[in-house]
Curated annotation (Swiss-Prot):
Keywords: Hydrolase, Purine metabolism. Utilization of purines as secondary nitrogen sources, when primary sources are limiting. PANTHER family: ALLANTOICASE (PTHR12045), INACTIVE ALLANTOICASE-RELATED (PTHR12045:SF3). GO terms for biological process: allantoin catabolic process; purine nucleobase metabolic process; urea cycle. Belongs to the allantoicase family. This is Probable allantoicase. Pfam families: Allantoicase. InterPro entries: Allantoicase, Allantoicase_dom, Galactose-bd-like_sf. Pathway: Nitrogen metabolism; (S)-allantoin degradation; (S)-ureidoglycolate from allantoate (aminidohydrolase route): step 1/1. Its EC number is 3.5.3.4.
Length: 342
């Protein structure tokens, strides 16, 4: 891939663009795994895929030197570069961009970086692996987010990615933005979580995500603490509601829903409403005709709420809107149903 095919985005531009269209395919929260690296003497390469923002502990030292929240290698590397290999969390994905974050690395940051990817559905990379360049070798400055959008999206699916830094140094976080390529069962009657990220579900819009990101709603598992759910700011005006829109991984018939308030004990929503729509748009417009599939229901703290036999389940849907009343936090949203024939 050439430099001309890469556009650098500001953090604000990136959050707006990728926030509506992509997920971080290598996030540990989505199942990403670091398989190996050339060296991580000063700071572990495992830190690269931590979904949390990097932090600083000024003045804190460990056995190898100053503590850093990221990946840091030895000085004086005699090889052309240091590298790390990461396996995507989902079965495979299409890549739309990437981020190399050097926050708090200043004077020990990686001077240059590049990214390559491979499709290996049956195994892991070895010395014979044919890597495809997706980010050309580019300068990498200190303590900043380097975020790139690919103007022409590679048409291959990828399962693994390799980040190289030249010749050595430190990087806080590595994000690989893109879309999950789902693998569906042949049986259309198979019961699926149509909203799950592994099946291509995507949170495309929300009213607010002050304390917890909207994308957390569709992650696997039930999370580890209150920080890995979706949580909005406290509302002060009468009649306020918050909402989130999910684009399903496949158009389908919605039978049941699960709304999990795990870890939200004093800040869960009072009530929830679910609406759905069959729309060709990525994000349904302001005049979209949503239909209710779950009228207002009370929620409780720190528990899974299962709602069965939802309304309008004979109509195929593409999107679900969850409305929480008046505000609060939800850990996970599951939308169970069956794929439509088309």
């Amino acid at each position: 891939m050439s430099v001309e095919n890469v556009e650098r985005l500001s953090p604000e531009q990136a959050d707006a663009f990728f926030g509506q269209s992509s997920v971080d395919l290598i996030s540990r929260a989505l199942g990403g795994q670091v398989l190996g690296c050339s060296d991580d003497f000063f700071a572990s390469c495992e830190n690269l895929i931590n979904p949390a923002d990097p932090i600083r502990k000024a003045g804190v030292f460990v056995e190898t030197g100053a503590w850093y929240d990221g990946w840091e290698t030895r000085r004086h590397n005699t090889a052309p570069c240091d590298w790390v290999i990461v396996k995507l969390g989902p079965s495979s994905g299409r890549v739309t961009g990437c981020e190399i974050d050097t926050t708090f690395f200043n004077g020990n940051h990686a001077p240059e970086v590049s990214v390559e990817a491979a499709f290996l559905p049956e195994g892991n990379p070895d010395a014979k692996t044919n890597w495809t360049p997706i980010l050309p070798k580019l300068p990498c400055g200190p303590t900043q987010r380097h975020i790139y959008r690919f103007k022409e999206i590679p048409q291959q699916n990828f399962t693994h990615v390799r980040l190289c830094m030249y010749p050595d140094g430190g990087i806080a976080r590595f994000r690989l933005y893109g879309n999950v390529v789902p693998v569906f069962p042949a049986d259309l009657d198979a019961r699926l979580d149509l909203a799950h990220m592994y099946l291509g579900g995507l949170v495309v819009q929300c009213s607010d995500q002050h304390f917890g990101k909207k994308d957390n709603l569709l992650l696997p598992g039930r999370g580890v603490n209150m920080g890995d759910g979706w949580e909005t700011a406290r509302s002060r005006e009468k009649g306020h509601v918050d909402w989130v829109i999910v684009k399903l991984g496949a158009r389908g018939y919605i039978d049941d829903a699960l709304i999990d308030t795990n870890h939200f004990k004093g800040n869960y929503p009072k009530e929830v409403i679910l609406e759905a729509i069959d729309s060709p748009d990525h994000i349904p417009g302001p005049d979209a005709q949503w239909v209710t599939i779950l009228p207002a229901r009370k929620l409780g703290p720190h528990m899974e709420h299962v709602f069965t036999n939802l309304q309008n389940n004979s109509t195929p849907m593409t999107h679900v809107r969850m409305i929480i009343i008046p505000d609060g936090g939800v850990k996970r949203l599951r939308i169970y149903g069956r794929r439509a024939a088309n």
